[in-house]
Regions:
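Core catalytic alpha/beta fold that binds nucleotide/phospho-ligands
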Residues: 2-132, 136-251
Length: 251
């Protein structure tokens, strides 16, 4: 089955691949990444196309959940196994930790995100990156009444100056970056980071710098967040070590 419309319109640092295990899958363009494909893999795929091959271990953690939640969880594990295979790692089981975080094989860092339509996964050898974080969001889901809990005063002031459509998109972008950063930092610190503890600073059309009020503030200063549209109504945020992306002028 084809990718949904939002994934068929590929983000500019993605390309669509047809064939092999990546049938109907959108994966990273590797001339945008300073790492070989054997060390770093990222992909986006429709949830409905990530249901097989599945294992009982994919279902056990969500056995009592509603069907939609089961499908989302399974999609993350199915796609993650495919990407791990691409970097030479055979992992039948990707369990969940106490905070529902994926427990990756030794030597691997990774991140999984999904919404109601699509699943995004990034995996890498920990010899080439410190950590990774990914998040995909539907534009418009961050209601204005949530801003005080999510954004710094500076971020809120910036949002208030925007027109409604741009405001809705940028609020989603800021939220998505902070979600991706949380996933990046958690395997390192094993600690909680609040949304307002992280400040996001736009650098150009698609990249953002971060600062954070956490015990190891260098974690934020050493990363770069890349954000790209997925069709007309979604965004995907990737947080990686700042040395990983080649600098792109994406408009």
């Amino acid at each position: 089955m084809a990718l949904p419309d939002e994934a068929a319109s590929c983000p500019s640092f993605f390309r669509q691949v047809t064939g092999g295990i990546f049938n109907q899958c959108t994966v990273m363009i590797f001339d945008a990444i300073n790492l070989p494909q054997s060390d770093f893999q990222l992909a986006l795929r429709a949830i409905e196309d990530c249901q097989e091959p599945r294992y009982q271990s994919d279902l056990d953690p969500v056995i009592n959940a509603v069907t939609s939640r089961q499908r989302e969880y399974i999609a993350g594990r199915v796609l993650a196994r495919e990407l791990l295979d691409r970097i030479g790692v055979n992992a039948q089981i990707i369990a969940s930790g106490p905070k529902r975080e994926p427990l990756w094989p030794t030597g691997i860092v990774g991140s999984i995100s999904h919404n109601e339509r699509s699943c995004a996964v990034v995996v890498a050898q920990n010899s080439v990156v410190t950590s990774v974080g990914i998040d995909i969001e539907t534009i418009g889901r961050i209601d204005r009444h949530l801003w005080a809990n999510l954004f710094t005063e500076e971020e809120t002031e910036h949002l208030q100056q925007l027109e409604p459509a741009a405001q809705s998109r940028q609020a989603t972008v800021l939220f998505s970056i902070k979600e991706a950063f949380y996933k990046y930092q958690y395997p390192i610190t094993q600690g909680w980071v609040g949304f307002r503890d992280v400040s996001v600073h736009q650098e150009d059309a698609s990249s953002y710098r971060l600062t954070a009020q956490i015990s190891d503030a260098t974690l934020a200063s050493n990363v770069l967040a890349l954000v790209e549209p997925v069709g007309a109504d979604q965004v995907i945020a990737l947080v990686v070590d700042q040395a990983v992306p080649k600098r792109l002028d994406i408009n």
